[in-house]
Amino acid sequence: MKKITNKPTKTDETTLGLRGLCAKRASTICYMIQQAKEHGVQDGAAFAREAITKYGEDIGQVVKSKMKNPDDLLEFSQYFGAGADRDIYEMEVVAQDEDRFYLDFHYCPYVAEWQKMGRDPEEMAELCDIAMEGDRAVGASFEAFAFTLGETIAQGCPVCQIRFDKVKK
């Protein structure tokens, strides 16, 4: 596995505070899986995936309810990864049109927290994949486009590749 590089460039007080909240979520996910196993849940990771999927479904429905046209990828791009999230994850909009909405995350507070917790690279890659169930579920809330997770910081790549593509009918 590649060496993980995850260095923030945005360090204003608000962004750092919001990243702290993300770090709490990251450690909670990690500990929930660990505790589920200790309490006899055979597959703590599956348990966490299902819970995070439900969370993502809820977010997807909220976003959908705000949109005038839930088939419009440009309108969706005004809600997903908007606001403070852009700074928290140091997002770069790689493509944004009626057929594609591509984001690259240049920083991940989840990975930073898992590194502080001493998690090994393989576990971080799995934890990342579990955490991304939320975004997968957001994407699945929309029939007109599909979500794809490309490479991730947790895998040792320089960015997390978040991709939404219009589904051709």
Label the predicted regions.
Residues 1-129, 145-169:
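N-terminal accessory segment detector
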Residues 126-139:
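A conserved amphipathic terminal alpha-helix motif
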